[in-house]
Amino acid sequence: MAHQAHAYHMVDPSPWPLTGAIAALLLTSGTAVWFHFHSLTLLTMGNILLLLTMYQWWRDIIREGTFQGHHTPPVQKGLRYGMILFITSEVFFFLGFFWAFYHSSLSPTPELGGCWPPTGIITLDPFEVPLLNTAVLLASGVTVTWAHHSIMEGERKQTIQALTLTILLGFYFTFLQGMEYYEAPFTIADGVYGSTFFVATGFHGLHVIIGSTFLAICLLRQIQYHFTSEHHFGFEAAAWYWHFVDVVWLFLYVSIYWWGS
């Protein structure tokens, strides 16, 4: 690499954005093919390519940031702004689902029976599994904060314990959500209620899986001594994302499960 007289990271050409984009195309088209033709081939190909891209792209970033020292303070500042803007874009993404839900529920049409929930829909009890899920996610928010403070204080073992606990709580939430879907008395095809419920809670569930993956990578990196008390932005970004997922769930719980039922 040529000598440079500034602190910014001039990245090398990388194939991973292209392979990531192809994986996204395969995943979206594969989901449509799965829904309509019951074939999992395209979806499986998309998942494999996405996993390969994630592994190799994150490997390269760890090499550049942790071992080559390219993540200087100005670069980290840029990464912080990038993560903040990414989470902001996610807020607007979920805003669309809440808009759809409130648009349909605040002025239900005659086709829905003029009431909400629509006539014939049996809703889920908000004080059973959804309330347990809320407690699980709030607890995971506490454990991820514990992990953050442990990293800043150089408490390696406590960080590993707290991160492990957070990931387990994330997987437990996903399991409970899956069981709730399996036992739900309505489907995604049951009119606007089914559509808004499953799309909003389903995308949130996907974000929980993504957040759990981020934290699992952070756990592996912590075990391999990648983080110091001063240099741990990878974990910080994952923690921000986890708190965002937490807050979105609270809005989902209050809006769709409690008020909407």
UniProtKB/Swiss-Prot annotation:
Mitochondrial matrix topological intervals: 1-15, 67-72, 153-155, 224-232
Membrane topology field: Multi-pass membrane protein
Transmembrane region(s): 16-34, 41-66, 73-105, 129-152, 156-183, 191-223, 233-256
Chief localisation class: mitochondrion
Name of this chain's protein: Cytochrome c oxidase subunit 3
SUPFAM superfamilies in alphabetical order: Cytochrome c oxidase subunit III-like
Organism: Salmo salar
One function term, GO molecular function aspect: cytochrome-c oxidase activity
Name of the coding gene: mt-co3
